[in-house]
Amino acid sequence: MSIDIDWERATSGPDGELLAERIRSFIHDKFQQIVLPRFIRSVQVTSFNFGTIPPELEIRDLSDPFPDFYEDDDENFSDSSEEGSPTREPVDRYGNRVDSWQANSPGGPGGQMYESNQPLRMPAWEEHTGISPLRGPMNFGDINPYLFPRSGTPGIPGGTSNLGYYMPLSGLSSSQTPLGAVARGNPFSGGWPDAHGARPSRRRSEAEPDSAQSRPSTANTGNTLPSRDSMSISDPHHSHASQGMPNNQGQALEPNIPPTSPNHPLDDTPPRRMREQKAEDFQVFCRTKYAGNISLSLTAEILLDYPMPSFVGLPLKLNITGLTFDAVAVIAYIRRRIHFCFLSPEDADTLMGPETAGGGGGGDTSEPNSSRRKPSSLLREIRVESEIGRKENGKQALKNVGKLEKFVLEQVRRIFEEEFVYPSFWTFLI
């Protein structure tokens, strides 16, 4: 089923101009965080326009929203702003209900406080031999995501009263993605947290203090320690090393490990809040085709190295006059919020089938496996024009102009894929 969009009404007026300015500012901030080549200086995004040609939308499926869309990470959006919204109870990283004193305090019952930041001393036998014991396998889904902060993932400058942005950190694709696992009916593979696992859900990067979660686990090191009989009696460190090993009665003495409780594990991750699912929540999969005249203007300087390095900078203006893409869009409606993102070709192929994934890399679709071939990017074509450095016959007078155009196009593709493709998504408050 096709959908007609009143593109002029949606992109014009004060609201359309405000949205265009926020997108321009967002792309500009992204370019300021990019390490520029030596011959380029001062890239500025000056304008953005939606154009006059609307995209073509075709509804392919309806389903329940993705679980990621129910994570409540907006501290400025109070419960009272939603009609009939029940009070949300905090849950821990495993999805269990957490009392208020547990959610706000790292202490245990009776006022006992667990020192989660107490450093662990290396066993004496390990210091003596210089060989580190084998550690147990680490679940990469539990690594503190703020060890790898993305300082370049702010919200839309100018306020987020009606627009939000979410970007989790992940490096898996194809069949290893959550969507691929759900479509096959299999649980997520190793390295992905489960449905109740902790996920980063902050729109702005925050400094994370050192925590027990951010350190490698030492829970399995007891099985790798050498036995008492295998150590030499003449070892001067023997008496100290035996403190971390089981004794003859099978009891272990670990004076350097802070006390823990199975009901209150050491975890500095703040409890996440999940919004309640309701029957009226829904999600739409749309095949989106666009070949319009959306425009983006950038200015930069090309540095000339003659007669000396960076002798002079020539201003250059680049105009992106249109682009073409074919992808599957996801639009979810959850109580006054609209979540929007695109699916990668792998996820779209898994969920919707190869015929709706936008798979053909070009115009040749006669081959049997052409629908399985994934394009290098969802953006199939980007048209760009430069206003300096061209002769009358159309050839470039400055060789670095072509390099600059290529660099800008690569960055535009990268920003689009990182910020608009699931598991990244945008949230609009309505």
Swiss-Prot record:
Which keywords does this chain's UniProt record carry? Answer: Endoplasmic reticulum, Lipid transport, Lipid-binding, Membrane, Mitochondrion, Mitochondrion outer membrane, Transport
Give any single GO term for biological process: protein insertion into mitochondrial outer membrane
Matching entries from InterPro entries are given as: Mdm12, SMP_LBD
Q: What assembly does the database describe for this protein?
A: Component of the ER-mitochondria encounter structure (ERMES) or MDM complex, composed of MMM1, MDM10, MDM12 and MDM34. A MMM1 homodimer associates with one molecule of MDM12 on each side in a pairwise head-to-tail manner, and the SMP-LTD domains of MMM1 and MDM12 generate a continuous hydrophobic tunnel for phospholipid trafficking.
Chain intervals with Polar residues compositional bias: 211-233, 241-251
| Region span, Disordered | 61-117, 177-276, 352-377
**The name this protein goes by in its record:** Mitochondrial distribution and morphology protein 12
- Domain comment, as recorded: The SMP-LTD domain is a barrel-like domain that can bind various types of glycerophospholipids in its interior and mediate their transfer between two adjacent bilayers.
In alphabetical order, the GO MF annotations are: lipid binding
Name the job this protein performs. Component of the ERMES/MDM complex, which serves as a molecular tether to connect the endoplasmic reticulum (ER) and mitochondria. Components of this complex are involved in the control of mitochondrial shape and protein biogenesis, and function in nonvesicular lipid trafficking between the ER and mitochondria. MDM12 is required for the interaction of the ER-resident membrane protein MMM1 and the outer mitochondrial membrane-resident beta-barrel protein MDM10.
**Compositionally biased residues, Acidic residues:** 69-82
Instruction: Report the residue ranges that make up the SMP-LTD domain in this protein.
Output: 1-430
Q: What PANTHER family does the annotation carry?
A: MITOCHONDRIAL DISTRIBUTION AND MORPHOLOGY PROTEIN 12
